[in-house]
């Protein structure tokens, strides 16, 4: 069995997502209630909050595809506050971001760590942002393997492949060399929002709305 992830313990409890505020809209046909995330989806805003897992990836991918079908020429905003998580789930989101026609703008609100940071950098260049006090962290994939020696060897090769693939993509997104990325992700590498701009993870720090 192989478990490959890019994650860190988060103060965010995804169970809290069950406590979602409702908003009421008035129209000529009366009142309509939305949960706040559905209402913001109408404004083409998607939230990636909490660990990146298969369930989260399916929701994000579905929302990206839906918004593309609604208007393929209008930007989508992806707000990220995540400690990271599954590499395969994160790559599903990444590939969909690159696949769809609309540009995807990313914004870090709080924490973008590990796979969360990878997805932050995956936004359209020139449209990757962070709030001033957010933190960004990059590191190499974490893996846990068990079983007989030959199985562990196979799993180790897969983790090394994923590390090389992630490093290559991050190098392209940041303008760094693969060697620099490999060195800088050898251990947890935390950055301030301003440092993330310098590194090439994001393009601008937003203190207020323009």
Swiss-Prot record:
Fourteen ClpP subunits assemble into 2 heptameric rings which stack back to back to give a disk-like structure with a central cavity, resembling the structure of eukaryotic proteasomes. GO terms for molecular function: ATP-dependent peptidase activity; ATPase binding; serine-type endopeptidase activity. Its main location: cytoplasm. The active site is at residues 114, 139. GO terms for cellular component: cytoplasm; endopeptidase Clp complex. It comes from the Bacteria. GO terms for biological process: protein quality control for misfolded or incompletely synthesized proteins. Keywords: Cytoplasm, Hydrolase, Protease, Serine protease. Belongs to the peptidase S14 family. PANTHER family: ATP-DEPENDENT CLP PROTEASE PROTEOLYTIC SUBUNIT. Gene3D superfamilies: 2-enoyl-CoA Hydratase, Chain A, domain 1 (3.90.226.10). This is ATP-dependent Clp protease proteolytic subunit. Its EC number is 3.4.21.92. It comes from Janthinobacterium sp. (strain Marseille) (Minibacterium massiliensis). It catalyses: Hydrolysis of proteins to small peptides in the presence of ATP and magnesium. alpha-casein is the usual test substrate. In the absence of ATP, only oligopeptides shorter than five residues are hydrolyzed (such as succinyl-Leu-Tyr-|-NHMec, and Leu-Tyr-Leu-|-Tyr-Trp, in which cleavage of the -Tyr-|-Leu- and -Tyr-|-Trp bonds also occurs). InterPro entries: ClpP, ClpP/crotonase-like_dom_sf, ClpP/TepA, ClpP_His_AS. Pfam families: CLP_protease. It is found in: Cytoplasm. CDD domains: S14_ClpP_2. The keyword Protease applies. Cleaves peptides in various proteins in a process that requires ATP hydrolysis. Has a chymotrypsin-like activity. Plays a major role in the degradation of misfolded proteins. Disulfide bonds: none annotated. Transmembrane segments: none annotated.
């Amino acid at each position: 069995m192989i478990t490959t992830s890019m994650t860190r313990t988060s103060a965010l409890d995804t169970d809290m997502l069950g406590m979602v505020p409702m908003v009421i809209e008035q129209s000529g046909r009366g009142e309509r209630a939305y949960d706040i995330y559905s209402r913001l989806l109408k404004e083409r805003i998607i939230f990636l909050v909490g660990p990146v897992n298969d369930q989260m990836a399916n929701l994000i991918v579905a929302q990206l595809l839906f918004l593309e079908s609604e208007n393929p020429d209008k930007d989508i905003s992806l707000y990220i506050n995540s400690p990271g998580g599954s590499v395969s789930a994160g790559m599903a989101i990444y590939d969909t971001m690159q696949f769809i026609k609309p540009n995807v703008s990313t914004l870090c609100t709080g924490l973008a760590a590990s796979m969360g940071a990878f997805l932050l950098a995956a936004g359209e260049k020139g449209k990757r942002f962070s709030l001033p006090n957010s933190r960004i962290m990059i590191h190499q994939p974490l893996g846990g393997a068990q079983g007989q020696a030959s199985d562990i060897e196979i799993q180790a090769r897969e983790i090394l492949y994923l590390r090389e693939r992630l490093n290559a993509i991050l190098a392209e997104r940041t303008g760094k060399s693969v060697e620099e990325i490999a060195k800088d992700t050898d251990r947890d590498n935390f950055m301030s929002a301003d440092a993330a701009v310098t590194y090439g993870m994001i393009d601008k720090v937003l203190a207020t709305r323009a």
